[in-house]
UniProtKB/Swiss-Prot annotation:
Record organism: Human immunodeficiency virus type 1 group M subtype F2 (isolate MP255) (HIV-1)
Family, similarity comment: Belongs to the lentiviruses Tat family.
Gene encoding the protein: tat
InterPro entries, sorted: IV_Tat (IPR001831), Tat_dom_sf (IPR036963)
Protein's cellular compartments: Host nucleus, Host nucleolus; Host cytoplasm; Secreted
Protein name: Protein Tat
Coarse class of the protein's main subcellular location: host cell
Region (Transactivation), start-end ranges: 1-48
Oligomeric and partner information: Interacts with host CCNT1. Associates with the P-TEFb complex composed at least of Tat, P-TEFb (CDK9 and CCNT1), TAR RNA, RNA Pol II. Recruits the HATs CREBBP, TAF1/TFIID, EP300, PCAF and GCN5L2. Interacts with host KAT5/Tip60; this interaction targets the latter to degradation. Interacts with the host deacetylase SIRT1. Interacts with host capping enzyme RNGTT; this interaction stimulates RNGTT. Binds to host KDR, and to the host integrins ITGAV/ITGB3 and ITGA5/ITGB1. Interacts with host KPNB1/importin beta-1 without previous binding to KPNA1/importin alpha-1. Interacts with EIF2AK2.
Motif (Nuclear localization signal, RNA-binding (TAR), and protein transduction) on chain: 49-57
Length: 99
């Protein structure tokens, strides 16, 4: 084991820095380049400032969502409009006529 000069800062020790600089490549080799690359690229963790997304704005001349809602017809009742009692009478009369 090599003797490390105590006067040198730990981050400047020989072998503490990778030989090549970090880059923007996301291949497996570059993801394991150094601990920082592993955190950023391999794990996807970055502690930088988050950029605020701006909303898309519609052009000033457009009239989207400016028209009033059109009147819709009233909902139709489903099934037999005569009511349940009359439909029961029809079923009873049909069962009596069928032998």
């Amino acid at each position: 084991m090599e003797v490390v000069d105590p006067k040198i800062d730990p981050w400047n020790h020989p072998g503490s820095q990778p030989e090549t600089p970090c880059n923007n490549c996301y291949c497996k080799k570059c993801c394991f380049h150094c601990p920082l690359c592993f955190m950023k690229k391999g794990l996807g963790i970055s502690y930088g400032r988050k950029k605020r997304r701006q909303r898309r704005r519609t052009p000033q001349g457009s009239k989207i969502h400016q028209d009033p809602v059109p009147k819709q017809p009233l909902s139709q009742t489903r099934g037999d409009p005569t009511g349940p009692e009359e439909s029961k009478k029809k079923v009873e009369s049909q069962t009596e006529t069928d032998p």
